[in-house]
């Protein structure tokens, strides 16, 4: 079995190390299969992720193993791999990969980057997004038909303000609607425009959709406006997703949403669909629209008493935003929440939930799917998993008290280790002689 295979891509040689390494155990698909997939749909993938800075999301052990986010481009890279320097809200900066051609996609696949995670800006203007992203994220227990209904209302709102929405499956359980916009507005303005969409959709169908940021307050389909904040990325069109069946994020027409099944779009099936239909988002760049009408809607919402909505925790507090929780104290929840556990591996955190259910079977019998809150917590190098339970549907006399976490893995140790290494680097290697 070859330890390396070389792909010739438009005159460039791309090496795939360990090409037969299985990345998807359920389907048996390998790293070489991943590289060949991205070559088969390269033009469509570059329409979504090309010419933009990309975060590398790497799965060296495949789906089910540990994965990590890599913002900084590897130092060892071909000279034809381009990078651009980004400044983040945290104050840090990093040089990120800018794929320009099919060879770059194959090179990223060799790093076991299953997903394509581009920023909504072009490399030649990092301050003005040209893409507005409406992320429809269903809470547990919500299925495709309800997502489909909400997407139709999103389309209606966009149509009314003169914008063209381009739908695609998320590659997981939800849907994305991307909108090409003129490069005239800041990240904050684009986020405010999407928040206006979310609130208008929620107003029209309050039982189906929500714009509530806190998980325990959500129902139905959450419209995640914060995916438009600076430093946030979303899987782009044709991106493979880390699901057991190797699903991909599939561009759709509005007409086929009614009858399609997101599970039908996979690493194995998408190349044939692409060869038959081409890129359904190929005309997106011809429909760059204006945010003026959405920002006017946002101003009317604000006049009606709707100020800004919560930002991701690591962002600086914004004017008009409600008070945030100080880092030294907990936010006072509106619902009876208890935390079950947190772990590096999602499976370990969910195993702790099953142990909790076994200990508290009477309470567990009253839980609804949306009462199980599984949070991804961004660590220094990877995403950790926290599991909480909302006891709102459990009779008060049956509600368990907060117990010691199980499992109780401390994600802050990861940051502490980085700080310790930095401190050691700053310490002189030789002690100063005493005077």
Question: How would you label these PLM feature ranges?
Answer:
Residues 1-29, 35, 46, 50-51, ...:
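C-terminal accessory nucleic-acid interaction domains of nucleic acid-metabolism proteins
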């Amino acid at each position: 079995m070859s330890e390396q295979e070389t792909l010739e891509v438009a005159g460039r040689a791309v090496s795939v190390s360990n090409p037969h390494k299985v990345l998807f155990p359920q389907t048996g698909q390998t790293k070489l299969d991943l590289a060949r997939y991205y070559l088969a749909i390269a033009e469509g993938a570059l329409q979504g992720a090309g010419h933009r800075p990309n975060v590398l999301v790497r799965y060296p052990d495949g789906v089910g193993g540990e994965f990590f986010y890599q913002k900084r481009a590897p130092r060892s890279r071909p000279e034809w791999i381009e990078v651009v320097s980004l400044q983040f809200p945290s104050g840090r900066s990093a040089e990120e990969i800018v794929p320009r051609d099919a060879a770059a996609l194959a090179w990223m696949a060799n790093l076991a980057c299953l997903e394509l995670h581009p920023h909504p800006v072009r490399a030649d203007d990092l301050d003005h997004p040209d893409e507005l992203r409406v992320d429809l994220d269903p809470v547990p227990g919500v299925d495709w038909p309800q997502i489909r209904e909400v997407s139709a209302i999103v389309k209606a709102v966009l149509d009314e303000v003169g914008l063209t929405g381009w739908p695609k499956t998320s590659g997981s359980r939800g849907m994305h609607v991307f909108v090409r916009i003129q490069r005239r507005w800041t990240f904050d303005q684009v986020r405010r425009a999407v928040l206006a969409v979310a609130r208008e959709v929620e107003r029209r169908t309050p039982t189906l959709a929500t714009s509530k940021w806190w998980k325990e307050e959500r129902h139905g389909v959450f419209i995640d406006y914060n995916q438009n904040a600076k430093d946030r990325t979303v899987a782009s069109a044709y991106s493979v997703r880390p699901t057991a069946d190797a699903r991909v994020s599939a561009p759709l027409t509005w007409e086929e949403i009614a009858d399609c099944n997101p599970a039908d779009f996979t690493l194995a099936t998408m190349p044939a669909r692409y060869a038959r239909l081409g890129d359904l988002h190929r005309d997106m760049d011809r429909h760059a629209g204006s945010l003026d009408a959405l920002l006017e809607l946002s101003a009317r919402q604000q006049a009606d008493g709707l100020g800004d909505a919560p930002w991701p925790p690591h962002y600086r507090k914004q004017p008009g935003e409600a008070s945030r929780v100080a880092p030294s104290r907990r936010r006072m929840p509106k619902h009876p929440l208890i935390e079950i556990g947190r772990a590096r591996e999602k499976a370990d955190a969910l195993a702790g939930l099953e142990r909790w259910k076994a200990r508290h079977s009477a309470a567990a019998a009253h839980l609804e799917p949306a009462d199980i809150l599984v949070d991804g917590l961004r660590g220094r190098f990877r995403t950790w998993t926290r599991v909480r339970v909302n006891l709102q549907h459990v009779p008060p006399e049956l509600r368990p008290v907060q117990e010691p976490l199980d499992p109780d893995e401390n994600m802050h140790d990861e940051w502490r280790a980085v700080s310790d290494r930095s401190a050691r680097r700053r310490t002189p290697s030789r002690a100063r002689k005493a005077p």
